[in-house]
């Protein structure tokens, strides 16, 4: 049996869903069963990687926890947002004293913005066909 406590969190953003499991450790990062030295390798961008793992930085747990991430759906930006929310929720399960800090940084709110559906008679969700006067 495992002797370390595992804390989990679920996060969603656009069409992405992320499940994060954190265990006390030395900062090992595993995303979709692949071990990465840094989040930038997966997200291919420093900004998205920093955004996704910001909860660890804000709570001073960067490098102190092993993070296991399962993320699917959407693109890299949506996945980064999903990981961020899931990680924040997992940190709160680990230690409830992190809640005010994470809440003040806006990391506990699920971003409700979704892609608007295309309507019939239009070219896109709101883009109408070009109007011809004559």
Curated annotation (Swiss-Prot):
Keywords: Ribonucleoprotein, Ribosomal protein. GO terms for biological process: translation. It comes from the Bacteria. GO terms for molecular function: RNA binding; structural constituent of ribosome. SUPFAM superfamilies: Ribosomal protein S5 domain 2-like (SSF54211). InterPro entries: Ribosomal_Su5_D2-typ_SF, Ribosomal_uS9, Ribosomal_uS9_bac/plastid, Ribosomal_uS9_CS, Ribsml_uS5_D2-typ_fold_subgr. GO terms for cellular component: cytoplasm; small ribosomal subunit. Belongs to the universal ribosomal protein uS9 family. HAMAP family: Ribosomal_uS9_B (MF_00532_B). PANTHER family: RIBOSOMAL PROTEIN S9, SMALL RIBOSOMAL SUBUNIT PROTEIN US9M. This is Small ribosomal subunit protein uS9. It comes from Pseudothermotoga lettingae (strain ATCC BAA-301 / DSM 14385 / NBRC 107922 / TMO) (Thermotoga lettingae).
């Amino acid at each position: 049996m495992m002797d370390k406590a595992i804390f989990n969190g679920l996060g969603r953003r656009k069409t992405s869903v992320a499940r994060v499991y954190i265990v006390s450790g030395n900062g090992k990062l595993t995303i979709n069963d692949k071990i990465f030295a840094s989040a930038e390798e997966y997200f291919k961008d420093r900004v998205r990687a920093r955004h996704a793992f910001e909860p660890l930085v804000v709570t001073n747990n960067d490098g102190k926890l092993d993070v296991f991430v399962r993320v699917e759906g959407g693109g890299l930006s949506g996945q980064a947002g999903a990981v961020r929310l899931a990680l924040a929720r997992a940190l709160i399960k680990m230690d409830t004293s992190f809640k005010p800090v994470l809440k003040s940084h806006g990391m506990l709110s699920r971003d409700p913005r979704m892609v608007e559906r295309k309507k019939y008679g239009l070219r896109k969700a709101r883009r109408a066909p070009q109007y011809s006067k004559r």
